[in-house]
Amino acid sequence: MAKMALIQRELKRDNLVAKYAKKHAEFKAIAGDVKRSDEERAAARLGLQKLPRNANPTRQRNRCAITGRPRGTFQHFGLARAKIREMAFAGEIPGIVKASW
């Protein structure tokens, strides 16, 4: 299980991304618009730089909802591969059965 501090840090990042999502999208749209003047685009890039570092969505990490494991996490389930295996064998995930051919 991951340390609680790491899980809390990730939750804090999620909150920051949600808080600044609208501003981030506006700045990105202006900075990428070639029809805008160079001054406007430079101002948008500067605005992006002034946002908190953890407000950038690329800094988010997918973690297992149960264990907090950062690697081997399936997006569809939100669980780590080991937990998916345990839960599937126990019959706790509907529609998943052990392969047999």
UniProtKB/Swiss-Prot annotation:
Pull one GO CC term from this UniProt entry: cytoplasm
Q: Name one Pfam family in it.
A: Ribosomal_S14
Q: Which domain of life is it from?
A: Bacteria
Supply the alphabetized keyword list. Answer: Ribonucleoprotein, Ribosomal protein, RNA-binding, rRNA-binding
The GO biological-process annotations, alphabetized, read as: translation
The record's InterPro entries line, in alphabetical order, gives: Ribosomal_uS14 (IPR001209), Ribosomal_uS14_bac/plastid (IPR023036)
**Keyword rRNA-binding recorded:** yes
One term of GO molecular function: structural constituent of ribosome
> What does this protein's UniProt record list under function?
Binds 16S rRNA, required for the assembly of 30S particles and may also be responsible for determining the conformation of the 16S rRNA at the A site.
**What family does the entry list?**
Belongs to the universal ribosomal protein uS14 family.
Q: How does it assemble?
A: Part of the 30S ribosomal subunit. Contacts proteins S3 and S10.
User: Which named protein is this?
Assistant: Small ribosomal subunit protein uS14
Native species: Albidiferax ferrireducens (strain ATCC BAA-621 / DSM 15236 / T118)
